C-alpha cells in the first residue's frame, strides 16, 4: 500500500458509512457484535487498536460502549487513506468534546509500520484484503506479538470460495442484493475500481495465516454472502 492508496467510493455523496451499509448486508449487526465482544477484552491502561479505521466509527463506539466499566483504556485508530482524514479529524474533535476523559488518537499511517504493544484488543474490519498478499502474514504476526495474553484479534474479511460454482452463485446473489441500493452501472464501476485493490483469501488461507502467527483457533461469529467476521484469542 503506497502513500497514495485511496478509496474513490469514500467520496460518494451518501458518505462512506452509509455506502458500506448498503454494500454489505448486515454491516451494522457486525459492528454491534464486535462492540459486544469487545467488552470481554478491553482493559484499563491497555491499547485498543482498530487498523484501517476509515471514518473512526468503530473506535468511537468502543469509547462510548466501554466507558462505564473501562474508562482508562487507550483507543487508537489507524488509517492510511487520505479521503478519510477530514472526517477523522472531525470525529476526534467530537469525541474529545463529548468525552473529555477519553484517551483516543487517530494515526494517519501505514499499519505495516505500526508497533503493536500492550494490546487487549485489535480489530481489522475489511482491511487485510486490501494489503499486498506478501504483507498480510507479517501484520498478523505483529498483531499477535503485540497482544497481551488473553487479548483478542477481531476481524472481518471478504473471502472467496474454493469451489468455483459456489463462488458464482454467491457472487450473483450478492449482486442481486446490491441492486436494491445501486444502479448496475455503479456496481460495475466499483468492481472495476476494486479489481486491482481487493484480493481476498479463502477462509482456509486466513485460518492458516492466523495459526502460523500463533493463534490456536479462529471462530467465525458473523457471515453474510462472502463476508465473514471472526475472533481469535492469544
Model-derived features with residue positions:
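N-terminal, positively charged/glycine-rich alpha-helical extensions of SAM-dependent methyltransferases
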Residues: 1-15
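Conserved alpha-helix/loop element of class I SAM-dependent methyltransferases that forms part
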Residues: 26-44
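Class I SAM-dependent methyltransferase SAM/SAH-binding core
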Residues: 49, 54-112
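A conserved beta-strand element that flanks and buttresses the S-adenosyl-L-methionine
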Residues: 123
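A short glycine-rich, Lys/Arg-flanked "PGG" loop and its adjoining helix->strand segment in the class I
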Residues: 137-149
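Conserved beta-strand signature within the Rossmann-like core of class I S-adenosyl-L-methionine
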Residues: 150-158
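C-terminal alpha-helical "lid/dimerization" subdomain adjacent to the S-adenosyl-L-methionine
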Residues: 158-211
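Core SAM-dependent methyltransferase catalytic element
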Residues: 207, 216-234
Amino acid at each position: 500500500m503506497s502513500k497514495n492508496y485511496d478509496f474513490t467510493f469514500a467520496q460518494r455523496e451518501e458518505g462512506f458509512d452509509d455506502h458500506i451499509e448498503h454494500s454489505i448486508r448486515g454491516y451494522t449487526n457486525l459492528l454491534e457484535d464486535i462492540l459486544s465482544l469487545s467488552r470481554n477484552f478491553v482493559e484499563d491502561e491497555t491499547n485498543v487498536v482498530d487498523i484501517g479505521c476509515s471514518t473512526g466509527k468503530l473506535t468511537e463506539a468502543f469509547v462510548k460502549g466501554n466507558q462505564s466499566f473501562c474508562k482508562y483504556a487507550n483507543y487508537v485508530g489507524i488509517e492510511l487513506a487520505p479521503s478519510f482524514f477530514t472526517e477523522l479529524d472531525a470525529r476526534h474533535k467530537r469525541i474529545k468534546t463529548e468525552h473529555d476523559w477519553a484517551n483516543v488518537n487517530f494515526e494517519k499511517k501505514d499499519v505495516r509500520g505500526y508497533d503493536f504493544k500492550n494490546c487487549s484488543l485489535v480489530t481489522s474490519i475489511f482491511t487485510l484484503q486490501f494489503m499486498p498478499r506478501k504483507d498480510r502474514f507479517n501484520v498478523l504476526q505483529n498483531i499477535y506479538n503485540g497482544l497481551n495474553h488473553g487479548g483478542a484479534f477481531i476481524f472481518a474479511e471478504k473471502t472467496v470460495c474454493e469451489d468455483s460454482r459456489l463462488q458464482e452463485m454467491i457472487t450473483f446473489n450478492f449482486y442481486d442484493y446490491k441492486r436494491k441500493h445501486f444502479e448496475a452501472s455503479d456496481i460495475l464501476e466499483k468492481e472495476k475500481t476494486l479489481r486491482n485493490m481487493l484480493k481476498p483469501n479463502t477462509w482456509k488461507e486466513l485460518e492458516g495465516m492466523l495459526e502460523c502467527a500463533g493463534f490456536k483457533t479462529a471462530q467465525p461469529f458473523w457471515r453474510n454472502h462472502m463476508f465473514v467476521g471472526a475472533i481469535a484469542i492469544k
